[in-house]
Structures are given as structure tokens and as C-alpha cells.
């Protein structure tokens, strides 16, 4: 019956049909891309219902927050909490996501079967990020993630970080000696410290003795390109669409150029490791490619993730640590007194690298230095809203049933600032918003397990957190032992980055 109608119609208007058909296919393709461009396509199908009640939705912020949660997430968090309460939905592109804001909700989420939790295939960013890092460890889910994570975890344990600590200290102490006094006045703190984590982790991955100055410089020359590509992935609309990968655009050429140069540098270091007989982390990991444990792209893109993507995270926290010292002179002075006492002991004692009091001090977890690092991490999550995850099972959070495959994000501002543990009844109002490292004298990390999520929570915590903490402690210890840190500008948040970076200037004054 339908054919009897369509065939004469097509014969009569065949020219229009010829032109219209490809246009229709293009429109349908673009619609599909638009739906998929923001990750998991939910399109209002999320249903959250209290026990025993008819189906109904949670409070919902209909404004598109896909960019806002990166660029102005703190303001978005405060606004949403005031208007929507503790548990709500927000729009991110073409899908809705559940937002968790309390430690209790976070605990209920992560106490569900974590094997059923997975990241969105584009981290909620878009297809361009998949082209750059789509096969790295952080993008994997299920058995693939478990298999790869087990391998990479063995190289980033606390023990591995401690064993590599002398190499870190050697580089940082030389870096301090080489600081130009003309370059430490009115300087961007991120610019000041950004070289430290990159170089230290590169030396760990590729072997300290095999990392020539030329090789390290070649790696560092790739940083601006990678940073630009990451920002494009998260902060532009075009970066969300898969179709743009098939056009010879400037950005896709940059992706190819970066990957080609990075692969060439890394493979040369693998060959150098084998020729010299010196084992390195990168070479050991490459053996798993040769054995078929994971693919070449899994290997090279995870090294990229560790060295370029995650190092920006570490350098940002290191910059915030200096900003907090400049903002809180009393805390800075207390920390300096602790550091100088240890340094004085180091100058008197007869020691080797393994028994150096300064190195022993930085490994301890019950010092004011450690508390300052934890407080910096608490107050400065790298993202105000976490990357979205989904669960393949039905969840119950705050008595609300959450349908499977619903994107879930964590409001890290509310968790890190407003959790009850940071605001005890015997302290002033909004004590959680104050930089107070001494709070950790009576709080253990276990107590704060679901009240601080800078490095993530659950089984997918940041791979490099052990190295990051030691780097931040070393930075503070060596800088404060020689310099007083002061602010020369008002502290603001950078508006053109996907991680929450400080926008200010500091000055280092020799003691």
C-alpha cells in the first residue's frame, strides 16, 4: 500500500528526490553526531523516583552547563545547590546528568558494585578528545581497564614513588640553585613550577640516566601543542563532533603531528634502553605491547596521559600550594619553622641519601608539611565537577532510584568545602572555606574518605597521586627553606583552562 503511494510520487518528483536524499542523510548524520557529541545520549530519559512513589524526576537545571562546569564551576555549584538542593539533574549538552553533593551520596554510589561503573566514552568532552587519548588507560572500562590498570599500578605504587624520591630531590635541589632572582619577582606561580613535575616524571618513565637534555627539551617542546589540543577538546563545540576528524583541519593535523613526534621520541628511548641494558618504565611497559597484553596505542596514549595530561594537573596543585602560602602568611611561617628545624638537623648529622633527615621528613605523614599539602588538595580540586560516570545497574542514592546508564557527576566544590567534617560545630561558620592545615591533626584520610575527591574516589583514583604528593611536599620544603612567598596580585581563577588554575602573580624574597 505504501509502495503504491511512494513509487508514483518518486517518479513524478525524481529530481527533487535525487537532491533531497543525500541532504536527508547528512541531516540525520549530524543529528546523530549532535546527540552523541556530549557523551552518553540520555535526552531526558533519566528517571529518578523515591521508594514507593510513582515515577518522577528530580529538580532539574535546564541551562546547558557543558562549558560552564569547566569555566565557572564554582558559581554553578553554588547556584544549583541553592535552587535544586542536595541531589538534582543538570543539562550537559544533549544529556542530563545526576549531580552528587554530599559525602553520604558519594558513599552510597561507590559502595555499589564498582565493577559496574564506567567512564563515558568521551569523558563528557567529545570525539576530538577520543582522537587524542581514546585508547589510554583512563578511557578504558570493564575488563580492559582492570587488565591495564593492574599493569600500570605496579609502577605507580607508594613504594615506587619513594624509591624514585632521591632522583626527584636531586633535580628539585638543582632547580632551586639555578633560580634566577630576576625571574622570581611578580611571576605566574604556574609558570614557575610547571617544569618540575614534567621533568621528574619524564626521568622516572624514560630513565634518569638516559634522559639527555636534548631528549627532555624535545618532549617539552610538545607541551604547548598538547595543552592547546586538550583545551580545544573540552572548551569548544567543534571539538565534540566526530565528523571533524575526517576533515584535514588544523587541529587534526596537530593531533597527527603531536602523536607522530611523541611516538618517534618514545620508541627511540625504548631502543636506547635495550641497547644500554638499563631497564626503564617505558621499556618494561612496551614489553606488554609485544606480548599482546595491550595495544601499541594503549601504551603510547597512556604514557601521553601520564606525562602530558596528568602533569598539568600536578603543576596546577603545586601552583595553588604557593598561592596558599602567599595568602596565609601565619601558616607559611609555621611551616617554614618546621622545615628549617629539619634542615638544621640535616646540616649537623652524618648521613647518606637514604638517611637524610630532609628526605625522611618529606616521607612522613604526620607533619605540618603533609597537612598543608592535604589542605591544598582539599581546597583546590582540579575540576569543580568530576568527569561523568555511568553504572550498568540500578542505584539507590538518598532513597532515590537512579536508572542504569544515567551519567553521574560529583560536585567537588560542595564535597570538598561543605562536608560536615570540614565544618565542625565548635568552629566558625564556613570554616570549610578557610585554609586551615591544622584541621588534619584530628582527621585521618580514612575519616575524610568521601569528603575530599581531588584525586577521585573509588577504584579509579588518580594513578599518579603518590608521586604528586611527594612532588608538592618537595616543592614547598625547598622553596620555603630559602624564600618568603608573597602575593603581588589578587587571586582569581583562570577562565580559559579546563582545570581550575590560579590567575595571579607571586614574589619570592630570599630569607
Curated annotation (Swiss-Prot):
GO BP term, pick one: secondary metabolite biosynthetic process
Class of enzymatic activity (EC top level): oxidoreductase
GO molecular function annotations of the record: heme binding; iron ion binding; monooxygenase activity; oxidoreductase activity, acting on paired donors, with incorporation or reduction of molecular oxygen
Residues reported to bind heme: 462
Result of knocking out the encoding gene: Impairs pulcherrimin production and subsequent red pigmentation.
Pathway: Siderophore biosynthesis
EC number: 1.-.-.-
Sequence intervals crossing the membrane: 14-34
Gene Ontology CC terms, in alphabetical order: membrane
Gene3D superfamilies tied to this protein: Cytochrome P450 (1.10.630.10)
Compartment annotation: Membrane
Chief subcellular location: membrane
Coiled coil: none
Topological relation to the membrane, as annotated: Single-pass membrane protein
Family assignment from sequence similarity: Belongs to the cytochrome P450 family.
Primary role: Cytochrome P450 monooxygenase; part of the PUL gene cluster that mediates the formation of pulcherrimin, a red iron-containing pigment composed of two cyclized and modified leucine molecules that acts as a siderophore, a chelator that binds iron outside the cell for subsequent uptake. Two leucine molecules are cyclized via a cyclodipeptide synthase, and the resulting diketopiperazine is oxidized by a cytochrome P450 monooxygenase to generate pulcherriminic acid (PA), which can then spontaneously bind iron to form pulcherrimin.
Name assigned to this protein: Cytochrome P450 monooxygenase PUL2
Source organism per UniProt: Kluyveromyces lactis (strain ATCC 8585 / CBS 2359 / DSM 70799 / NBRC 1267 / NRRL Y-1140 / WM37)
